[in-house]
Amino acid sequence: MSEGSEDTKTKLDSAGELSDVDNENCSSSGSGGGSSSGDTKRTCVDCGTIRTPLWRGGPAGPKSLCNACGIKSRKKRQAALGMRSEEKKKNRKSNCNNDLNLDHRNAKKYKINIVDDGKIDIDDDPKICNNKRSSSSSSNKGVSKFLDLGFKVPVMKRSAVEKKRLWRKLGEEERAAVLLMALSCSSVYA
């Protein structure tokens, strides 16, 4: 009985040092060593663990590393290749902002007149716009300037009753689209 217990101790001690094939824990056919194919035990090549929720591929082959060692191995490999996720993120952010950077001094200016009957008159003469810019802000009632785009847009304010009436007319898909657009424009915080 002491021989059997010594045998299992040596197998347990050597589990972290040797691979599954050396420990005879793997069986390619159902008759190898009296163990079924469901009893195969994997050990991590780096740390020797046998319990992990996810096995990852490593230098020793597929599913040879535990989750933690697989992540470490991937990070080391990426660092060796010169691929850093931080640099990628910075590049992505800078590329996104380059599209919206406009030179406001060279942007074409438009003058928008709102006529009483609801029509909008657009004048693209820059001299008129520059003269009107020096006037007081009270003349710009109902017009909002979008600085990022360099032009003026009329702002129409609706009463609460009109908003509710319009909201009722919209279907479920249209309401969802309006809410998504509001979230993407950062006008509503979730």
Swiss-Prot record:
Record carries keyword Transcription regulation: yes
Keywords of the record: DNA-binding, Metal-binding, Nucleus, Transcription, Transcription regulation, Zinc, Zinc-finger
UniProt key word DNA-binding: yes
SMART domains given in the database record: ZnF_GATA (SM00401)
Gene Ontology terms: cellular component: nucleus
Region of interest: Disordered: 1-42, 77-101
Basic and acidic residues bias: start-end ranges: 1-14
InterPro entries: Znf_GATA, Znf_NHR/GATA
Localization per record: Nucleus
Highest taxon, organism lineage: Eukaryota
Start and end residues, zinc fingers (GATA-type): 38-92
Gene Ontology molecular function, alphabetical: DNA-binding transcription factor activity; transcription cis-regulatory region binding; zinc ion binding
Family stated for the protein in its record: Belongs to the type IV zinc-finger family. Class B subfamily.
Protein's UniProt name: GATA transcription factor 17
Organism annotation: Arabidopsis thaliana (Mouse-ear cress)
Recorded name of the encoding gene: GATA17
